[in-house]
């Protein structure tokens, strides 16, 4: 039969695998991290809307999917809109589909002064996400890395004022976009700090900074400076 080296387990946990890879040691397989998101509802047998109100169901669905497929990271992520929603944006919550944006937080750039950074402990669905994070750390955190999604500052800006208005403002009212990115950055920092305090590492989604949406020039002017500050902040916390 096949001889196994005494120190090599037949199947490593994701954390063991990551540690071995970082040291350049032998691993049982390469890490694999699919973006399952709300697909976990199908595995667990709940409705996607259950994640809007129940931290326990959100955590248990994540765990069920992780146990079924054995991938290398569990991430608290339902949709792109819990953060703008926490700042006053309106969302559509289908019974069994992913939440979508209905109205941005402000209808006009002149209302920008009304925007305040979110409070992850009190606003919208964010307290549910934080509670789900705690369950995940308790239940599987010793064997698999648990991460928390956050949107980047420029994506925040687009969801706070609306995509079309924000992209127009990049040309016509650049100072407005900078203000939106700043309040987005402060919101992102508040949320990642709450997640890091629980023991998670943040992952940043910045879809509105894609080349399909903005040019590299616009990216360098508006998105990159705030994204860099967010990444630097996360690194300063040791993540």
Predicted features and spans:
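Glycine-rich, N-terminal phosphate-binding loop and its surrounding beta-alpha-beta segment
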Residues: 62-91
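Flexible, glycine-rich active-site loops centered on histidine and acidic residues
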Residues: 45, 87, 111
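Active-site loop segments of alpha/beta catalytic cores
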Residues: 3-41, 46-49, 61, 72, ...
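Short, basic/glycine-rich phosphate-binding loops at helix/coil junctions
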Residues: 105-116
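Short, structured active-site "lid" loops
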Residues: 50-60, 67-69
